[in-house]
């Protein structure tokens, strides 16, 4: 399938889904390189500057969702990771796959700090896991 067609199809399916996917990708980059939350913020700033063509395709709600999510994750990064660590029984955080860690970070942030309904989070995270996991 043509990559441009795939992107258009995602935008048509729902703006926040595409925005959530972008948040996931940024968090994944940080988790894959074992970077800090400050580096997540730096990567986000670089993303905004260097991917102007893609950013221009986002609507105001999508861009605001991405910005608020990244800022919220950066602000609460260590708390989010602590919550995940406390709730993973018999499994070390470091042993969780990078994709799965990034998905857990996004899901935990949305559930605890954005009060997104758990049904929405579960559906969206499962869809991202199918695509990237």
Identify the role of each PLM range.
Residues 1-132:
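N-terminal interaction/assembly modules
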């Amino acid at each position: 399938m043509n990559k441009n067609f795939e992107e258009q199809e995602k935008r048509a399916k729902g703006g926040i889904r595409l925005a959530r996917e972008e948040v996931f990708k940024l968090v994944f980059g940080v988790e894959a390189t074992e970077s800090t939350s400050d580096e997540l913020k730096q990567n986000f700033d670089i993303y905004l500057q260097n991917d102007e063509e893609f950013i221009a395709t986002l609507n105001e709600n999508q861009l605001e969702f991405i910005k608020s999510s990244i800022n919220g994750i950066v602000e609460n990064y260590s708390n989010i990771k602590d919550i995940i660590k406390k709730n993973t029984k018999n499994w070390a955080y470091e042993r969780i796959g990078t994709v799965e860690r990034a998905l857990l970070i996004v899901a935990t942030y949305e559930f605890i700090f954005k009060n997104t309904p758990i049904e929405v989070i579960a559906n969206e995270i499962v869809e991202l896991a199918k695509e990237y996991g």
